[in-house]
Amino acid sequence: MKPMKPTTLALTTTAALSAFSLQAWQTVAYARNSLSDAPPAPPNILLIVADDHGLDALGCYGNPVIRTPNLDALARDGTRFTNAFCTTASCSPSRSVILTGQHNHRNGMYGLQHDEHHFQCFDTVRSLPVMLADAGYRTARVGKFHIAPESVFAFQTVLSKGAANDPATIGRSPVEMAELSRPTIESADPRPFFLYFATDDPHRSNAFTPDGTTTFDTYPNPNPFGNRPAGYPGITPVVYNPADVIVPPFLPDTPAARAELAQYYQAVSRLDQGVGHLIDILKRAGKYDNTLIIYISDNGIAFPGAKTTTYDPGLQLPCIIRAPARRHPGAIQDAMISWADLTPTILDVANDTPPDAAARFDGRSFRAGLDGEKLTGFDEIYASHTFHEIQMYYPMRVVRTRQYKLIHNLAWPLTYPFALDLLQSPTWISATKTNHGEYFGKRTIAAFLHRPEYELYDIQRDPGELHNLAADPAFAAVKNGLIEKLKLFQQRTKDPWFSKWSYE
């Protein structure tokens, strides 16, 4: 075989390279087209759940006194929801809804998860961490858990354990929680992560009597809300003057209430610093832009008139969401969403909506509104409360629209029961010792403890929910229409208490 001439060799080589380049370009172009047609890669998911953080104590929600610079910055970079509601103002039941998309009367978490209560979800329930793990996510949790059984709410990695409201738990030290989360965030594992970051703050802190009994009794001193002289690693305490705090309208403006609100504010500011440290870790790892960040609370502020009630201070909560590829930072979303919608939304963002989602979940995805876009059909929410502690049986079912709220007190002849942390709060104790024990804020103590079967409020005209319209003939049509909505809700969500309609 004759050797090729240099010119021939050059031409042949050029042709071969051109052919290779064309093939390579076609391959890359095809890959690009294929990628553009495919759904985006699922993002990391960071779900931050505070404990008893009401709408009343965040700068971005209008409080000019509280210092929450990190959560305010997250709101400026994401979307702030103004009509977000938990479905029950009680810790374990609310968390079960957050992580299943089912109301607690359906998933079985009727009340608080403690050994003496034995409330837990049904074994057949599939939770968010399990579904995300099946979809290829790395799942981890840190901080407060307070739901059961662990087999239903299984996380691949448990970064910390601690009893609920344990004074020594890691859930009071949010910077340490963030540091424990660092390996999960910084891992080189190509799989996305789901991190459940649940603080004990700003829940009231408890102590133990010599015989080991839990107590919240600090009267006449305010509950410390987890604040302690020794402080916490990485935290710069922000101390508030009781004279400066803003007393919510449903609370009495008393020295006791102000002293406790000052402690509550300090716990919120500590929580905010932990969130800031966590987000800084995300940014330094280069994963902030590809992480869905959700900040919520399980229920409202731990004061009588909010927590464990179905009044708005217990149900209407902060919700700040920063979605990857957001186009409108600082957006405001006024759609009415509830915590039953969170699991369907997160799975939708993760491209893992199950085919039976409509039947499996009591909520629905609001992914289309994560960037502040107008959502249609999100104009009412439902709430369902049955127990808090085991002795606190007081089932309530609620429908709230933009104008009206109907509360059905199913066991209305009973005296409204008190959670231990609220009963022993100096704010409540001092109110019962003043004004002849007649008023708690603008509501009479008698009205707080003894409620009628139905409560109907015009939220727009009566945001304090003080004037019950249920017995007013002028509102009979409104009341009856909302009752029918409640019945359909209970049927649809398989509420065992629906049977009371037939025999009472």
Mark where each language-model region is.
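Bacterial N-terminal signal peptides that target proteins for export
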Residues: 2-14
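C-terminal segment of classical bacterial N-terminal signal peptides
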Residues: 17-27
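Short, structured active-site-proximal loop/turn typified by the sulfatase FGly-forming signature C/S-X-P-X-R
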Residues: 63-95, 101-105, 129, 133-140, ...
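Polar, glycine-rich mid-to-C-terminal structural blocks
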Residues: 363-368, 378-381
